[in-house]
Amino acid sequence: MSSKLVLVLNCGSSSLKFAIIDPANGDEYLSGLAECFHLPEARIKWKLDGAKQEAALGAGAAHSEALNFMVKTILAQKPELSAQIAAIGHRIVHGGEKLTHSVVIDESVIQGIKDASSFAPLHNPAHLIGIDEALKNFPHLSDKNVAVFDTAFHQTMPEESYLYALPYKLYKEHGVRRYGAHGTSHYYVTQEAAKALNKPVSELNIITCHLGNGGSVAAIRHGECVDTSMGLTPLEGLVMGTRSGDLDPAIIFFLHDTLGMNVGAINNMLTKESGLLGLTEVTSDCRYVEDNYDSKADAKRAMDVYCHRLAKYIGSYSAQMDGRLDAVIFTGGIGENSSMVRELTLNKLALLGIEVDAERNLAARFGKSGFINKEGTRPVLVLPTNEELVIAQDASRLTA
């Protein structure tokens, strides 16, 4: 075991993911998830030394109770592990325009995360709680906390990609522009794709698709992001689990003026009641959609809209590749595991010279990476992401 392990924290609005990782080799010594915060069934699950355990946190518990449990109960089982933690890495969804790369956390960074909270109101306030609790529980690491931003990798986008066609003063005065998300994942699979394709990252032209409950596509030219599907917030772009993705902005006026919905209700609908959930009227789970595609109209409808939107983005981003597209990459929970999403999407992209090999496509699931295209056709690659490792490596590098 290395003496320089990193505790990685990912605080969501109602959950906390945590892991202790060796940044040198990626070995994971502890991983866990606390969820259902503020509810009677708040609970925590973890895996330590290969053994899975679970406990109730108590009704109404949240980030504070979860981190306290991790330190005083889980790590108490293995004090030598706690002693090896040399840094803490925090996943931060939105860094705005000021926080453009991973950075050691100080008061100015905390203020920057607060300033960007209006662009990620569900996530950034939760991240700030996580930082505060980490500082309380690990006072000896007060100068070893590092923020890693989901928006950072997309900061190489040119102006024509990140500006909206709105009055320019909205950007100049209020930072209204496209920022993207899932940048840590897009960055990781870009590095891995370079290895798989045996190319230097700086020569790589790829389109990366991070598909999970949230989803985004990125255009990577010469190893740098030049466009991505999420915008000012993670609501823009693809069809997602419960998020609408792209829509005509005038739909909002229709919902308000004609149907009498208030702004809060519209926001709730677009973020929590749309996407696969809205299209099926049953669930946000892609597995339901895949399992029932041939037998239920709601599942077919949702899958077809999902794949149509995804194919449109891949097709449009091919125009940004300077005439050479090296590969299309799939990652994230759906991207790594749904052979159906990949096949139905890629079948729409014959113009790009893409042909799916059915056998390879079925094989590249459940943590297995691999090429899924037919030999001699445009490379398409499934790569499991590892955002936690990137966060651990950045935290280790910046606090060394």
Swiss-Prot record:
The cysteines joined by S-S bonds are none
The entry's free-text remark on the cofactor is: Mg(2+). Can also accept Mn(2+).
Q: Give the required cofactors.
A: Mg(2+); Mn(2+)
Protein residues bound to Mg(2+): 10, 387
Q: What is its EC number?
A: 2.7.2.1
GO biological process, any? acetyl-CoA biosynthetic process
**Keywords assigned:** ATP-binding, Cytoplasm, Kinase, Magnesium, Metal-binding, Nucleotide-binding, Transferase
Q: Which reaction does it catalyse?
A: acetate + ATP = acetyl phosphate + ADP
Give binding positions for ATP. 17, 210-214, 285-287, 333-337
Chief subcellular location equals cytoplasm
| Active site location | 150
Q: Where does substrate bind?
A: 91
Q: Which PANTHER family match?
A: ACETATE KINASE
Oligomeric state and partners?
A: Homodimer.
Name the UniProt record assigns to this protein: Acetate kinase
